[in-house]
């Protein structure tokens, strides 16, 4: 009986250990492609090693429908998602996303308030910038005011077929200060866009299309994502861009309500935005760290920092998009108005 008791005790210990080990894992969801590959190398694998956990990965272009579906069951299978802040805000308001536990997240707490919501924290940054062809233009535009000035800056133009970022550019071109954009004056923005509409050769709908337009010389200037124009610039010496008047955007990390591995998810999110891991992301992709403290680690050269949208110098030249405004009733109405405008 004594031996039997010992065996039983060992079994209990083994089961307890196995259960504990199983709990030390999360399912992380992002958008896939080279972006998720870069995250895996810079952040996910190192975070897993630091925390001694397993990170299972999934990818989906738009996480919101699945967040909604999983939330309705009350038993989601995902733990952490990398998604636009508007999804985190909407999910938080609908009881599908957990509020941030700042007391348990020192790295998150130390980040600028503008870089987080009550439910999420900035993970990486990208920008909608003004790109141009230096060969075809006698002088290159350096602001959206220049882009709208067709008399002094003649040439073919393209804008993104989406109101987010485009309405901000219109208002910046009309003299609205970067820090006074929100709430957007939607009527003023659409009026300003109507002025430039006859001079827009292409309303592009994908990052690949915008890059091709610039690389092939189909347009002389356009709105384009910094990662796309940066890639074109490496192979085409005639291409340039400016961060001045850029529209700075980010994706954020948030934790699903009733996540199966909530405690581990909290530890992961805080580790994922630590300055050291954040500083490694630009080694693999032209996105900026979500945590500005990454630029003080010494891991990013001054030259590399100047190429990134979220460096202190470049961020100061740009307007930070308010996803909270875009997820409001006014923002949704502005989006609905877009389809009629571009027809």
Enumerate the language-model features and the residues they cover:
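Conserved C-terminal helix/tail region of periplasmic/extracytoplasmic solute-binding proteins
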Residues: 314-343
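A bilobed periplasmic-binding-protein/Venus flytrap-type ligand-binding module shared by bacterial periplasmic
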Residues: 129-136, 171-176, 250-264, 269, ...
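Periplasmic-binding protein-like
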Residues: 110, 125-128, 187-196, 233-259, ...
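Mature extracytoplasmic/periplasmic domains
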Residues: 256-318
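Sec/Tat signal peptide C-region and signal peptidase I cleavage site
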Residues: 17-23
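A ligand-binding cleft/hinge motif common to bilobed small-molecule-binding domains
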Residues: 86-90, 215, 220-238
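Early extracytoplasmic/lumenal segment of secretory-pathway proteins
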Residues: 24-90
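Extracytoplasmic ligand-binding site segments that recognize negatively charged/polar headgroups
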Residues: 33-40, 76-215
